[in-house]
Amino acid sequence: MVLYTTPFPNSCLSALHAVSWALIFPCYWLVDRLLASFIPTTYEKRQRADDPCCLQLFCTVLFTPVYLALLVAALPFAFLGFIFWSPLQSARRPYSYSRLEDKNPAGGAALLSEWKGTGAGKSFCFATANVCLLPDSLARLNNVFNTQARAKEIGQRIRNGAARPQIKIYIDSPTNTSISAASFSSLVSPQGGDGSRAVPGSIKRTASVEYKGDGGRHPSDEAANGPASGEQADGSLEDSCIVRIGGEEGGRPQEADDPAAGSQARNGAGGTPKGQTPNHNQRDGDSGSLGSPSASRESLVKARAGQDSGGSGEPGANSKLLYKTSVVKKAAARRRRHPDEAFDHEVSAFFPANLDFLCLQEVFDKRAAAKLKEQLHGYFEYILYDVGVYGCHGCCNFKCLNSGLFFASRYPVMDVAYHCYPNGCSFDALASKGALFLKVQVGSTPQDQRIVGYIACTHLHAPPEDSAVRCEQLDLLQDWLADFRKSTSSTSTANPEELVVFDVICGDLNFDNCSSDDKLEQQHSLFTRYKDPCRLGPGEEKPWAIGTLLDTNGLYDEDVCTPDNLQKVLESEEGRREYLAFPTSKSPGAGQKGRKDLLKGNGRRIDYMLHAEEGLCPDWKAEVEEFSFITQLSGLTDHLPVAMRLMVSAGEEEA
């Protein structure tokens, strides 16, 4: 399938569209600024309360007549531009595809050659987030503002979080339940390798810090500054760090004589100091940014290499990193596993390291989408943005906004399809909300069979009273997904050209699994075909699952204004009741605070990550390895991003 890199099929239409939008934009911008000046956020209200001279109010009164005068002057030009813009939308393509050619060893082409579908399994990490990048006046209805600056900061934080070192902690205690047994293979053999998954006979208590290249580096950094310090000439950045936290004999750490340790890159073994991660270069968003990998003391283990046998009499001091046990235990405590759970789950201050696929919702503003794309291209090679339709093309109602869907991938995209929900009503009818379907290639077998996966990203109808509309959209979602798989799958079942190893649905579904008003959606057949890792059954959540919709009134409180603070708050039941949104109460006169005191549960979880256990290739299985609720976008959106790591392996393999 040919992917569309431009919104129009030829340059003539593109030029005509650019001219028509240039005529419309001044009017659009003035209306947005005029409305935004009358919708203050709680942050701005607090600033005004601290302003004894009422300077901000004076500016609003002063500039409102100016905006109105300019708006009247811009209206004729906007009307002329609209005459050309509207019919052009019938020829507009439903998305724009962008690929950044990446020569890094972690680029998409190199990733395909890593995994042949034999030997060890491979994990893939998915994340979804509603980022509320609406025009500024509409974003303020959700108590967020400055859409353009937020778009850039969101991109920086996601990039820095995904490109940070991947930390895994392994403890040999047979009673420990805070670590992932399924993750152990990634310590023994690198992901994507075909090496044996055999467990060494003696496992020491270790913490593994794995990082796979400076994927978070901005594309322009290397051109301007040259290769990052510490990078090898060939760009290979495969390194790891073993941290001893237990198993001492006589008060001294044991030597790293394991077979597993022998497969790790040893710190200080070469001329390059391995204790410094290459993606800690000074770059956009690192200095003072909450998205910096160094922003959280508790989410990362800080490594520092020792001097070359300078002040240490202990042999091998510069090839081992010693840490206090309490520091590593603090990091390990972030992962908690329920006794009956087969995977790790946590509230994390960072997006998962080595994030493979990112699905975003509410990226409605075109300029914000461009800024977001520019930032994320520092890590993701393949991006689809500006997804949706405008005008009356393909839908009953006139569409002023696109779908808001945005997709980024480290792996090549093979096929794409988009469908607009035809039953939108109320204010949701102004946006072309729909579903984006993607087929990605993640490897190839020795027999030249492609290893592929399917991903669907969607955003359902928002008004809470329209349950029937959402159920109809879920029906359409399943039908469209079945048609997409049928139209893009290999024709021969006896000798297939492709192996399907995962099928994932993610997005903002705008209903939860705890509200009595959402019973219709909770019992939908989608949840029989796709598994929700956070759900026990209709209306029943797993005890560790928390809501993903924040109470907008508290977005700028000091307790939750940073990723670390929000993480700590959400780990306590009292904090969740204070800062998460809960189902609306039907009892009249019940205050927000008093209502929450009477509620049970952990808030409204409306952002979902679902995966299929059936419909994959025979003898293959996809199992959840980790599930995360992420606080890294605190203060930038009213939703919590969620992430899921799937371990894909042949069914006959032993874990």
From Swiss-Prot:
Inhibited by nSMase inhibitor GW4869. Binding of anionic phospholipids (APLs) such as phosphatidylserine (PS) and phosphatidic acid (PA) increases enzymatic activity. It is an enzyme of class 3 (hydrolase). Coiled coil: none annotated. It is found in: Golgi apparatus membrane; Cell membrane. Its main location: Golgi. It comes from the Eukaryota. Keywords: Cell cycle, Cell membrane, Developmental protein, Golgi apparatus, Hydrolase, Lipid metabolism, Lipoprotein, Magnesium, Membrane, Metal-binding, Palmitate, Phosphoprotein, Sphingolipid metabolism. Palmitoylated, palmitoylation-deficient proteins are targeted for lysosomal degradation. Disruption phenotype: Defects in smpd3 are the cause of fragilitas ossium (fro) mutation characterized by severe osteogenesis and dentinogenesis imperfecta with no detectable collagen defect. Mice lacking Smpd2 and Smpd3 are completely devoid of neutral SMase activity but do not developed sphingomyelin storage abnormalities. Mice lacking Smpd3 develop a form of dwarfism and delayed puberty as part of a hypothalamus-induced combined pituitary hormone deficiency (CPHD). Growth retardation is probably due to delayed ossification of long bones. Its EC number is 3.1.4.12. A lipid is attached at C53, C54, C59, C395, C396 (S-palmitoyl cysteine). This is Sphingomyelin phosphodiesterase 3. Pfam families: Exo_endo_phos. Mg(2+) binds at E362. Belongs to the neutral sphingomyelinase family. The modification Phosphoserine is found at S178, S289.
